């Protein structure tokens, strides 16, 4: 039986802040935990058996925002807990990247601090600069492309997705398959975004995808802004923020969003009679990945490293794949024939046949400024 504990309320999380550190990087830490705190790999710490033994002695994994119904985190946490007999404290009262960084900073030396962080890549980069993350290399990290891991070993891309087009197949006679298609007058009042591109990652990356579909590049997002100005002027783009519920009611029958979210929405509203399909735009798209990292001040340093090993193992990556995300090691697992083919087959073929481009940190920062300066003027 798994030992999964969800901390669901802010009050509980706040109360946890008062707990003194029994296992943190301060006094009272066991010799084995102290050894693993400085270990940069399984080999450096004495091998996998030694890591498992030390982790089981610590007994608990503290994480935040790993919502059970997102990316199959529920299945991943259960499998880890059952395999190693480790209790999971999963604080789901909050969970944004910034929330996790704040928790790490505010809970220094406390039992309640996080062992593991699951953040946007830009947050991992910033956290590395602030020396909040431990250097630790999972055994399978060599399978990751160089642009999907930090040079100093503080973070690794474990899951991600591709911008796609979701469409209510019953409400729309012919679903669009490209950004160009979305400009067709027959889609007037039908197309929606998940939110304001100037304040949200999803919207920002959707504009990036539109730029690549219209002659832009990862260094030039302006064609994407111009595209959405045209889509808005045509009346095709509506101001509603799309969620699964607005698809179900028919308010937003066509939605641009991450493929893994669209696929999850389809599952959630299928029993409502909605046939929601997901297509990767044929004329251009982008991908984006989350970063997995270990808190340098983790109260359970051996557990944190064992969890990192599990996330990047074949088992862990396949469990994430069941949640419709693209595991970081997907290409290597396909080559090694260790991928779950049934789960892989549920992803759009175009999302897995060829990796979509992903902007680097410098490109993100420069183009976010372009978007912030020009979106409201162009689209309103």
Regions found by a protein language model. Name each.
Residues 336-380:
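Extracellular/periplasmic bilobal clamshell ligand-binding domains
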Residues 160-164, 225-230, 236, 271-296:
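Periplasmic-binding protein-like
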Residues 1-21:
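Sec-dependent bacterial lipoprotein signal peptides
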Residues 286, 290, 294-355:
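Mature extracytoplasmic/periplasmic domains
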Residues 20-34:
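Bacterial lipoprotein signal-peptidase II cleavage site
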Residues 46-56, 66-87:
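Short, polar/charged alpha-helical segment
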Residues 123-126, 248, 254-274:
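A ligand-binding cleft/hinge motif common to bilobed small-molecule-binding domains
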Residues 62-77, 89-105, 111-251:
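Extracytoplasmic ligand-binding site segments that recognize negatively charged/polar headgroups
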């Amino acid at each position: 039986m798994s030992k999964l504990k969800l901390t669901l309320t802010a009050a509980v999380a706040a109360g946890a802040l008062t707990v003194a550190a029994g296992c943190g990087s301060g006094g009272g830490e066991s010799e084995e935990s102290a050894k693993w705190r400085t270990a940069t790999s399984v080999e450096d710490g004495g091998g996998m058996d030694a890591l498992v033994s030390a982790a089981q002695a610590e007994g608990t994994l503290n994480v935040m925002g790993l919502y059970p119904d997102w990316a199959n985190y529920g299945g991943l946490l259960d499998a880890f807990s059952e395999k190693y007999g480790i209790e999971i404290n999963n604080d789901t009262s909050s969970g944004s990247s910034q929330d996790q960084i704040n928790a790490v900073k505010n809970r220094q030396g406390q039992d309640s601090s996080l062992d593991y962080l699951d953040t946007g890549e830009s947050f991992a980069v910033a956290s590395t600069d602030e020396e909040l993350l431990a250097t630790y290399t999972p055994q399978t990290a060599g399978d990751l492309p160089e642009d999907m891991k930090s040079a100093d070993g503080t973070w690794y891309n474990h899951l991600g997705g591709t911008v796609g087009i979701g469409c209510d197949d019953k409400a729309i006679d012919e679903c669009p398959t490209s950004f160009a298609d979305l400009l067709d007058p027959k889609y007037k009042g039908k197309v929606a975004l998940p939110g304001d591109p100037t304040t949200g990652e999803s919207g920002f990356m959707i504009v990036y995808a539109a730029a690549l579909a219209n002659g832009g590049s990862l260094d030039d997002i302006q064609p994407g802004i111009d595209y959405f100005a045209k889509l808005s002027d045509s009346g095709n783009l509506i101001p509603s923020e799309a969620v699964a519920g607005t698809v179900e009611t028919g308010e937003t029958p066509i939605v641009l969003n991450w493929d893994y979210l669209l696929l999850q929405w389809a599952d959630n509203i299928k029993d409502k009679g909605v046939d929601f399909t997901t297509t990767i735009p044929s004329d251009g798209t982008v991908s984006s990945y989350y970063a997995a990292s270990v808190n340098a001040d983790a109260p359970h340093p051996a557990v944190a490293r064992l969890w990192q090993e599990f996330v990047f193992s074949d088992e862990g990556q396949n469990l994430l794949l069941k949640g419709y995300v693209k595991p970081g090691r997907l290409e290597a697992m396909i080559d090694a024939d260790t991928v779950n083919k049934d789960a892989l087959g549920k992803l759009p073929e175009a999302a897995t046949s060829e990796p979509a481009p992903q902007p680097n940190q410098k490109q993100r920062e420069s183009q976010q400024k372009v978007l912030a300066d020009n979106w409201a003027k162009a689209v309103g």
